[in-house]
């Protein structure tokens, strides 16, 4: 396994997963432009706060799901998609809570 020198996060050799406390999680799609990635991460974190605030309301959990799909962390694995499919996924609008 290789460490990402920019974030300190350990990745599997194929780059498809990160390793946190010995557990593998799907990595964010590396083709997402940095600005859009930052926007999606911000939306994801807002939805996570909303999950806590609403004690896990379905709409809040659905918001987390939508953001994670857009980031490539859930849904069809990004390495199985064409570049056009990947671009369409991250360009799909993802609402913020209370927007």
Could you tell me what each predicted segment is?
Residues 2-99:
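Extended, charge-rich alpha-helical interface modules
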């Amino acid at each position: 396994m290789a460490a990402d020198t920019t974030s300190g996060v350990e990745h599997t050799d194929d780059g498809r997963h990160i390793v946190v406390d010995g557990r593998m999680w799907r990595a964010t799609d590396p083709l997402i432009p940095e600005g859009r990635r930052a926007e999606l991460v911000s939306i994801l974190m807002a939805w996570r706060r909303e999950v806590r605030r609403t004690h896990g309301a379905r709409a809040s959990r659905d918001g987390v799901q939508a953001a994670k799909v857009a980031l490539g962390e859930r849904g069809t694995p990004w390495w199985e998609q064409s570049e056009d499919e990947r671009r369409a996924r991250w360009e799909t609008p993802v609402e913020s809570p209370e927007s």
